[in-house]
């Protein structure tokens, strides 16, 4: 299977299946000598792991990270960094009765069309279990970015038709992490929980919107045309199985505005930086960060695995009643939050390392230019020396002739 690697300068590859013995991630392009807080890495995995509340799947996976290469004495070595996570609570027997059924909303049919085979146990490679590895890689990326003053904050903006109030300028991480749906609005959080419980009781699921805000991203980060920062964010977030849409800044709301309203004028701040009045663009213009907060939102579909019966076809073409007996999330938004943060962090770190290479290349070019200038001066001096020596030889020869 191809396309298992993400990134350009900071790359990672994930492997493993939901019901296999292990899942893992290998990171390449990690600089040597960087400190990694293993406890913080585990904390990020704990935010995503199953069984953490009444609105998540009861599957009991500790998701303990095992760093098996590229790490020694608390620091990276510069070699590929590999992290393994053991699967400990698989119940493959739950999937036996549905092995030949084309599961609605799942990748079974499309994988069969592409590969001719599909691991039906928990969705195999297409399972959301793979996102634990993205969180592991993203946790490391977050630590590196924090050293540059970059902070990434994700939260559940809405569940079904319940929308959190985000009108205040400051979104509190403490408030977000204090409720099981990870909403920035405690009142809306309670309503979201009620909606999720109601859907679960009915054997159903609900979707929502997850928002990610990046603070401290330096202006100028990003590339034009085919490697735009916002394009890379959209690509990264759309690689998550449950995501059906991405918007940045005003996003789709901009389609209902006139240009005179959606355009965002600049002003010069007291510190001399140019800022935008409203940040309608969500921190990115022309594919390059403008120094404002980067604001991203993703549409999270209702989880496809539900216990409510659905009519669908099996591989023989017969219509059958389908329902899932396994353990599944009635709403995945709370667990998507750390995953979305991770993917945003990985895109940012990829661009930061690319920018560093460009800066290093530019510095190298400047040094080479200075060396070339010095070489030119040396060449001119050598020519002058030859002329001088030639003139001395001519004068000496003339003196000898005059003596004769």
Please place each PLM-identified region on the residue numbering.
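N-terminal, positively charged regions that mediate nucleic acid binding
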Residues: 1-59
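Glycine-rich, N-terminal phosphate-binding loop and its surrounding beta-alpha-beta segment
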Residues: 44-104, 108
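Glycine-rich, mobile lid/loop segments that gate access to catalytic sites or pores
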Residues: 113-225
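Alpha-helical support elements that line or immediately flank enzyme active sites
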Residues: 21-33, 128-150, 227, 231-235, ...
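Internal helix-turn-beta structural module
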Residues: 305-368
């Amino acid at each position: 299977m191809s396309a298992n690697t993400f990134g350009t300068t900071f790359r990672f590859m994930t492997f493993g299946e939901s019901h296999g013995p292990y899942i893992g991630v290998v990171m390449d392009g990690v600089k040597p000598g960087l400190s990694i807080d293993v406890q913080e890495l585990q904390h990020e995995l704990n935010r995503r792991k199953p069984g953490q509340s009444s609105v998540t799947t009861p599957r009991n996976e500790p998701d303990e990270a095992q760093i098996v290469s590229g790490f020694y004495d608390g620091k990276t070595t510069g070699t590929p960094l590999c992290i393994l996570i053991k699967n400990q609570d698989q119940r493959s027997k739950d999937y036996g009765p549905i092995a030949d059924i084309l599961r609605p909303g799942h990748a079974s049919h499309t994988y069969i069309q592409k590969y001719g085979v599909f691991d039906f146990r928990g969705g195999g490679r297409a399972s959301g279990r793979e996102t634990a590895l993205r969180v592991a890689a993203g946790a490391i990326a977050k630590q590196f970015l924090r050293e540059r003053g970059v902070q990434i904050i994700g939260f559940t903006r809405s569940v079904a038709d319940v929308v959190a109030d985000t009108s205040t300028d400051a979104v509190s991480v403490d408030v977000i992490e204090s409720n099981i749906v990870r909403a920035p609005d405690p009142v809306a959080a309670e309503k979201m929980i009620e909606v999720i419980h109601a859907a679960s009781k009915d054997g159903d699921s609900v979707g929502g919107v997850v928002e990610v805000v990046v603070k401290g991203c330096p202006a100028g980060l990003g590339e034009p045309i085919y490697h735009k920062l916002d394009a890379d964010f959209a690509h990264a977030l759309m690689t998550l199985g449950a995501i059906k849409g991405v918007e940045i800044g005003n996003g789709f709301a901009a389609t209902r505005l006139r240009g005179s309203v959606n355009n965002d004028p600049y002003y010069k701040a007291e510190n001399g930086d140019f800022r935008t009045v409203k940040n309608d663009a969500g921190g990115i213009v022309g594919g390059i960060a403008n120094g404002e907060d980067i604001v991203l939102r993703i549409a999270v579909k209702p989880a496809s695995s539900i216990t409510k019966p659905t009519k669908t076809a099996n591989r023989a073409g017969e219509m059958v009643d389908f329902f899932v007996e396994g353990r599944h999330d009635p709403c995945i938004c709370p667990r998507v939050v750390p995953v979305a943060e991770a993917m945003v962090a990985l895109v940012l770190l990829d661009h930061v390392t690319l920018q560093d290479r460009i800066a290093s290349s530019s510095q190298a070019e400047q040094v080479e230019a200075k060396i070339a200038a010095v070489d030119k001066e040396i060449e001119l001096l050598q020519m002058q020396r030859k002329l001088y020596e030639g003139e001395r030889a001519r004068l000496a020869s003339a003196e000898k002739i005059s003596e004769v």
